[in-house]
Amino acid sequence: MSFTVAIVGRPNVGKSTLFNRLVGKKLALVDDTPGVTRDRRPGEAKLIDLRFRIVDTAGLEEADEETLEGRMRAQTELAIDEADLTLFVVDAKMGLTHVDKTLAEMLRKRGRPVVLVANKSEARGSDSGFYDAYTLGLGDPCPISAEHGQGMMDLRDAIVEAIGHDQAFPPRDDEAETNVSIPRSAVGEDGEEIDEEPAYDETRPLRVAIVGRPNAGKSTLINRFLGEDRLLTGPEAGITRDSISVDWTWRGRTVKMFDTAGMRRKARVTEKLEKLSVADTLRAIRFAETVVIIFDATIPFEKQDLQIVDLVIREGRAAVIAFNKWDMIEDRQAVLADLREKTDRLLPQARGIRAVPIAGQTGDGLDRLMQAIVDTDKVWNKRIATAKLNRWLETQQVQHPPPAVSGRRIKLKYMTQVKARPPAFMISCTRSDSLPESYVRYLINGLRADFAMPGVPIRIHFRTSENPYETKKKR
């Protein structure tokens, strides 16, 4: 991306709608409630022939530094300072307010490039607000409708004029963009038999979502990883509303980490905005590969904690538990032993899941947590040679034969791995519909133990093998 643009303005002027328009996706939550956006949300924008990095920000308000609104304002001001250009959005339909004028004065004092955007200019009665925008002293306002996509060519021209043609259209390095080696494993050749077990790619970027109940310490943990106050934190529950992604590097490996809104029990989620936030969290889980579920070590294993883990496993993601606020625990050795016993007992569907005690406030245990994420990702990507699987299947049947149905024993004939991420296997057998669930669990637990696959979802699909003599009998 050649340059960075920050979208700023007071609450509810249409900043997130414009952000979604420019990135071409509904990444930012949009609602009539003021103050929906709280953290900085980055994205890759496309506007006609322009390509640039865009940052959505919280609505700017006059507030004390100690308040939530004051902390949101500090994040927005940081986005302005880091950007090459600011899109200052005002509501042409409603007209200017005292806050608009205060923000315009702040932007003028900074002396950075600014494009004044008069949004909602398609609305009846917007002319007065549009002409009032000239009084802000930030040049000609650019009339647009972010919701309907009107005025985008004018906005493109205003950006090029403000940023300069050379920065807007830097020379392209075609070789850097096209000469990319894509490993075969990235293409996805699921369903093929595996003769050799491919090595784990230590350089592949990791996608990690951080989830949990409200106020479990998710944003604090990510800030500690980054070494900066990138995300809003505080004692107020439910600060995070959007799923925000941040990029950083751990031991030379790129990590894209998603902060998410706290997930409460479904019965308690009644407001439309909170429902949108939870839906956004679910999208983050599905986009991620490894999901870290934050438990509050002082009150662990709430019903909602267990339901979140179950959701992650059902979605097929690799899961890791982080027992946060470990610095508040006194008899740590005894408590850790108790927590691990309860983890295995209460989460049989994720037997062996890695659980790491951490302290997000102090940073204790973060290296151990990252190592657990990498180790779990290795298992989630694991592929096992077909020959090994069939030898294993034969041994399992000797040790514990499948049950008999109507006096005839079910035979498991052949096994192969059909995909990874998560590991999934196909077994060809007789009477697959009669195989009891208890025997399926026996096979899954055996795979976990014998092939070192703790804590990740394992899928087994059964296919009834055809009897070649069946058609002859019917003739």
UniProtKB/Swiss-Prot annotation:
Residues reported to bind GTP 2: 212-219, 259-263, 324-327
Q: Which UniProt keywords apply?
A: GTP-binding, Nucleotide-binding, Repeat, Ribosome biogenesis
Which InterPro entries has this protein been placed in? G_ENGA, GTP-bd, GTPase_Der, KH_dom-like, KH_dom-like_a/b, P-loop_NTPase, Small_GTP-bd
Q: Which GO terms describe its molecular function?
A: GTP binding
Pfam families assigned to the protein according to its UniProt record, in alphabetical order: KH_dom-like, MMR_HSR1
Keyword Nucleotide-binding found? yes
Q: Name one GO biological process term.
A: ribosome biogenesis
Q: Where is the EngA-type G domain?
A: 3-167, 206-381
Which positions bind GTP 1? 9-16, 56-60, 119-122
Composition-biased stretches (Acidic residues): 189-199
Disulfide links within the chain: none
- The segments labelled Disordered in the record are 168-199
Q: Where is the KH-like domain?
A: 382-466
Q: Does the keyword Protein biosynthesis apply?
A: no
Q: Which family does it belong to?
A: Belongs to the TRAFAC class TrmE-Era-EngA-EngB-Septin-like GTPase superfamily. EngA (Der) GTPase family.
So what does this one do? GTPase that plays an essential role in the late steps of ribosome biogenesis.
Instruction: Name the PANTHER family on file.
Output: GTPASE DER (PTHR43834:SF6)
Subunit architecture: Associates with the 50S ribosomal subunit.
Q: What is this protein called?
A: GTPase Der
Report the source organism: Rhizobium rhizogenes (strain K84 / ATCC BAA-868) (Agrobacterium radiobacter)
